[in-house]
Amino acid sequence: VTVEDHQSTPTHIELQPPVTIKSYVRRGEPFESTYTAVPERVVAMWQNSIETIIALGEGDRIVAGMGIPNRKYVRSEYREAYDKIPYKDMKYANLESVLMMKPDLLVGWRSTFTNKGLRTPAFWQARNANVYIAESSLGAQSALTMDMEYQYIRDLGRIFNRNMEAEKLIHDMEQSVA
């Protein structure tokens, strides 16, 4: 698997000041990632990550989207952007393939980042790639809250310098559940 021929090269955008985001590893221990620029080569796992990045207007930065069995499951307003993602599959690509994609950000759930999966955040940080793990993927379903989802969207908004878009998504979600 290679995405070297990925046609669109996203614009380089520096973050001033740099953005530091707290995320969590498998057992819920926090770790921090600092972003000095908006990520340009994103590997996104699972539908929520892919759709949120697209909703923020940053779908052209996704070089691989994994975890969606068929495009029909993608919200209709996001399908055009989803179709442009160079590598799409229900299953994770193997580690070697992901390394060849040269990501600078990987977004997924805690189950993604294990020694048996796509390795730990420390593995990726040693290769100049940040990792963002959704807090909602850490615990039991009964512990999930909308605030966790809103924080997830806010964090991605900060990472991609799309704070206004993130707040609009959150506002729309709040209106739909009110």
Please report, for each region that a protein language model flagged, where it lies by residue.
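Extracytoplasmic substrate-binding proteins
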Residues: 120-178
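Short, conserved catalytic or adaptor-binding loops enriched in Gly and charged residues
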Residues: 11-13, 77-82, 123-125
